[in-house]
Swiss-Prot record:
Family under the similarity heading: Belongs to the neurotoxin 10 (Hwtx-1) family. 08 (Gtx1-15) subfamily.
Species of origin: Grammostola porteri
Effect on the protein upon substituting I10A: 2-fold decrease in activity on hNav1.7/SCN9A, and no change on hNav1.5/SCN5A and hNav1.4/SCN4A
Reported effect, F34A: 13-fold decrease in activity on hNav1.7/SCN9A, no change on hNav1.5/SCN5A and loss of activity on hNav1.4/SCN4A
Taxonomic lineage from the root: Eukaryota, Metazoa, Ecdysozoa, Arthropoda, Chelicerata
Name assigned to this protein: Toxin GTx1-15
Amino acid sequence: DCLGFMRKCIPDNDKCCRPNLVCSRTHKWCKYVF
């Protein structure tokens, strides 16, 4: 299961849906990185 943009997540545990979506350690949600 994966999470979409700005969905709450647990760093190092949850997987965000796209390769350039990562779980932010600061905000604890999936955000885009470029």
